[in-house]
Amino acid sequence: MIDLDFRKLTIEECLKLSEEEREKLPQLSLETIKRLDPHVKAFISVRENVSVEKKGKFWGIPVAIKDNILTLGMRTTCASRILENYESVFDATVVKKMKEAGFVVVGKANLDEFAMGSSTERSAFFPTRNPWDLERVPGGSSGGSAAAVSAGMVVAALGSDTGGSVRQPASLCGVVGYKPTYGLVSRYGLVAFASSLDQIGPITKTVRDAAILMEIISGRDENDATTVNRKVDFLSEIEEGVSGMKFAVPEEIYEHDIEEGVSERFEEALKLLERLGAKVERVKIPHIKYSVATYYVIAPAEASSNLARFDGVKYGLRIKEKGLREMYMKTRNVGFGEEVRRRIMIGTFTLSAAYYEAYFNKAMKVRRKISDELNEVLSQYDAILTPTSPVTAFKIGEIKDPLTYYLMDIFTIPANLAGLPAISVPFGFSNNLPVGVQVIGRRFADGKVFRIARAIEKNSPYNENGMFPLPEVKA
């Protein structure tokens, strides 16, 4: 085994390796997974062996794919019993682009079932553990992807973000997580949760690596009508700093319970940006306080429609019963976990004729208000800044109450409701656990979001050799 520390190996560093070293990267990744994953449990499926083709600029670099993104030749389970043995007949567009660029998919990462959760405890198979503390959650729903990168099992990963599911686990695991502007990345091959909110995004060790992956996976796709034919440059201005920029901090975030250490790191990040020549001001965004409530009407409604296809007829689990109705009911009751069933029921209720106007339609109006207010602020400021998560990683099994659990995404949900680009960049610790700072930008100003995040990363007093230090998992 070549002497390379995967915890410190970035995409850019991989490009500097010799041809012989790059040939061995996928096997080294598999060996690291074999050694560490019994403790971290980041993967649902892992390839037994991989072949390396020297095609594409990024050939040989090992990555993980969240297990709700379709991959040819590997299971796509969505961490659900109902799709436990499902194999797709095609690659998702993002996977196809990654493979064409030369990346090697070594495994499929664990998640909360159908991406419904914020801790990766709600996988039908097993909870994933945070590499910083194996008794704690990695966040979710892309917890497996974040943990795999944080533990140094892969160089990078893809996740999906519906209400913070890339950014929140990135924050809790001390890595970078990016949600693009809605429409920049194809959702073709992503098993839908809430179609108007879902976006695929990268999880990496550095901001530059995330921008590199966005250059690869973004672009118009004829298979996804919501993608836009618009070229965004993610890298050309990434090193230009923040001098002269203006940032907005919503006053409403201070109305919520924020862990003391998280609040301290956030204020420290704001002072850093001011020292770098930026101006930071507090602003009012009145309707942002309704983001979580709005999300938990709209997302379950869309999920109840999207998940109706999993009925035991065409693919996935099928429980034999006497009649069709009984088969439907038994299959869905056995195949879906508690949280998925809860959200399907909520969504079905809010879409019903008697309650559609009172709940779903009203939530859509509030969503528009939130979006308008965010866009108004962003017309006057370069970005909105918040903590990524109000807390650091909590202990597995600690949170039982669904409402407390839902509030984990209180700072990340607004960007999904408005379709805005947002990134979580690691910045220091609270009680020896990573803290993330979130940057939210204007639609299609993804390049500027990366530029701001890079300035934070580049000047952070907590980073070593240009990146946040990652933990050593005791195997």
UniProtKB/Swiss-Prot annotation:
Reaction(s) this enzyme catalyzes, per UniProt: L-glutamyl-tRNA(Gln) + L-glutamine + ATP + H2O = L-glutaminyl-tRNA(Gln) + L-glutamate + ADP + phosphate + H(+)
Any one GO MF annotation of this record: ATP binding
The protein, known as: Glutamyl-tRNA(Gln) amidotransferase subunit A
Function comment: Allows the formation of correctly charged Gln-tRNA(Gln) through the transamidation of misacylated Glu-tRNA(Gln) in organisms which lack glutaminyl-tRNA synthetase. The reaction takes place in the presence of glutamine and ATP through an activated gamma-phospho-Glu-tRNA(Gln).
Active site (UniProt): K66 (charge relay system), S141 (charge relay system), S165 (acyl-ester intermediate)
A Pfam family of this chain: Amidase
Lineage: Bacteria, Thermotogati, Thermotogota, Thermotogae, Thermotogales
Record-level GO cellular component terms: glutamyl-tRNA(Gln) amidotransferase complex
GN (gene name): gatA
Family: Belongs to the amidase family. GatA subfamily.
